[in-house]
């Protein structure tokens, strides 16, 4: 929902920009501007997917390393990952805060979006 809201806001801003300055821009400039914005939005979406994949992969490797070392500790793999890489509040849970609460387990409200306290479970 948050990504949709941001996309809608960008489209409205683009429409306002083109409407306000449209007479000063040629059709080729308008097309170039729209194409550049669309390309940047696509790149952002791709990078978000890569980031989520990397976080999950690193968490799995750290968990396996800890299992192989047979360290006797009460820390979970999520806590170790947070301490070593200082990733606090990542990744985004994929929902917006409603009344300061989040429906997804393990997520807290970091207005306007819900963020995880730790990492997604390895089964996800």
From Swiss-Prot:
Annotated S-S bridges: 93-107, 97-109, 102-114
Cleavable signal peptide: 1-22
Cross-link (Cyclopeptide (Gly-Asn)): 89-117
Pfam family, one: Cyclotide
Residue ranges of coiled coil: none
GO annotation terms (biological process): defense response to bacterium; killing of cells of another organism
Tissue-specificity statement: Leaves and stems. Lower in roots.
Changes after translation: Kalata-B1 is a cyclic peptide which occurs in three forms: with unmodified Trp-111, with Trp-111 oxidized to form oxindolylalanine and with Trp-111 oxidized to form N-formylkynurenine. Oxidation is enhanced by exposure to sunlight.
Record-linked PROSITE patterns: CYCLOTIDE, CYCLOTIDE_MOEBIUS
Entry keyword set: Antibiotic, Antimicrobial, Cytolysis, Disulfide bond, Hemolysis, Knottin, Pharmaceutical, Plant defense, Signal
Residues that make up the propeptide removed upon maturation: 23-88, 118-124
Domain of life assignment: Eukaryota
Family: Belongs to the cyclotide family. Moebius subfamily.
Entry text on domains: The presence of a 'disulfide through disulfide knot' structurally defines this protein as a knottin.
Task of the protein: Probably participates in a plant defense mechanism. Has antibiotic activity. Has a diuretic effect. Has a uterotonic effect in humans. Active against the Gram-positive S.aureus with a minimum inhibition concentration of approximately 0.2 microM. Relatively ineffective against Gram-negative bacteria such as E.coli and P.aeruginosa. Inhibitory effect on the growth and development of larvae from H.punctigera. The unmodified form has hemolytic activity, the oxidized form lacks hemolytic activity. If the protein is linearized, hemolytic activity is lost.
Name of this protein: Kalata-B1
Organism, as annotated: Oldenlandia affinis
Gene: OAK1
């Amino acid at each position: 929902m948050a990504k949709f809201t941001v996309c809608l806001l960008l489209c409205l801003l683009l429409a306002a920009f083109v409407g306000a300055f449209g007479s000063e821009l040629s059709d080729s400039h308008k097309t170039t501007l729209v194409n550049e914005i669309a390309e940047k939005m696509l790149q952002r979406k791709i990078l978000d997917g890569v980031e989520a994949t990397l976080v999950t992969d690193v968490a799995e490797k750290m968990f396996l390393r800890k299992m192989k070392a047979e360290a006797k500790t009460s820390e979970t793999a999520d806590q170790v990952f947070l301490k070593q890489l200082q990733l606090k509040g990542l990744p985004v849970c994929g929902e917006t805060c409603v009344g300061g609460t989040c429906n997804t387990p393990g997520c807290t409200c970091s207005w306007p979006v819900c963020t995880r306290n730790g990492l997604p479970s390895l089964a996800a």
